[in-house]
């Protein structure tokens, strides 16, 4: 597939952009090249694609649900109970919708943390964009939960580390109020050992 965008604004200059096989081949004024598809970019600007640095993509499924309430009431009374009924297939379709919306708005990479992360990873693979997907790590300050969560994250890393070149596995400790200090240190060390990204919720709202 090759594409030629004509007369587009790039770095405050009007130019053409030629792309082929998923890569930019040349940028310049009045390019004399042929392409399978040509677009007129007059009045438009060419920008690098955007990065969504933190998302729960499958929560597109809950858009409009339980709006305008305090964070912890929203989490404990509304979101966590409904999330308990989610399946991997539901997460896949919610994430697919999010991927389509991101593509439409110019985002080609997302950093995601959510339940049933296998579904999100499949959605990324099928959508064509890139991303890091983290399994949610919550131990609620309980030692037995912590042991279970560590084992689950280790297993997910081993299972998904070679899933797809565009999709990488990351670590997602939920927050300092749902993950013990000991588990946070374990996440830090595990991520450093395997060169993984970490995302966490900080300074969200007053309790």
Locate each region found by the language model.
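Divalent metal-coordination and catalytic microenvironments
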Residues: 8, 22, 43, 54, ...
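Histidine-rich, glycine-flanked metal-binding segment
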Residues: 2-4, 9-47
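Short catalytic-loop micro-motif centered on adjacent basic/acidic residues
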Residues: 108-112, 170-173
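Histidine-centered catalytic micro-motifs
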Residues: 49-60, 197-206
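Metal-coordinating catalytic core of metallo-dependent amide/deamination hydrolases
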Residues: 120-207
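Short, acidic/polar
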Residues: 89-99, 114-119, 148-154
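Active-site gating loops and adjacent loop-to-helix segments of metal-dependent hydrolytic enzymes
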Residues: 61-93, 100, 127-142, 147, ...
């Amino acid at each position: 597939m090759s594409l030629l965008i004509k007369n587009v604004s790039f770095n405050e200059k009007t130019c053409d952009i030629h792309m082929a096989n998923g890569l930019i081949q040349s940028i310049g004024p009045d390019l004399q090249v042929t392409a399978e598809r040509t677009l007129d970019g007059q009045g438009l600007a060419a920008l690098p694609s955007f990065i969504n640095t933190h998302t729960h993509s499958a929560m597109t499924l809950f858009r409009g649900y339980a709006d305008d309430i305090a964070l912890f009431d929203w989490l404990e009374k509304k979101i966590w109970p409904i999330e308990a009924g989610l399946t991997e297939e539901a997460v896949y379709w919610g994430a697919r919708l999010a991927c389509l919306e991101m593509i439409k708005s110019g985002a080609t990479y997302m950093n995601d943390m959510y339940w049933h992360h296998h579904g999100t990873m499949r959605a990324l693979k099928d959508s064509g964009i890139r991303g890091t997907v983290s399994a949610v790590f919550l131990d609620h300050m309980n030692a037995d939960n912590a042991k279970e969560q560590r084992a689950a994250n280790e297993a997910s890393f081993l299972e998904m580390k070679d899933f797809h070149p565009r999709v990488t596995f990351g670590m997602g400790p939920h927050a300092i109020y749902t993950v013990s200090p000991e588990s946070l240190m374990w996440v830090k060390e595990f991520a450093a050992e395997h060169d993984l990204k970490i995302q966490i919720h900080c300074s969200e709202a007053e309790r």
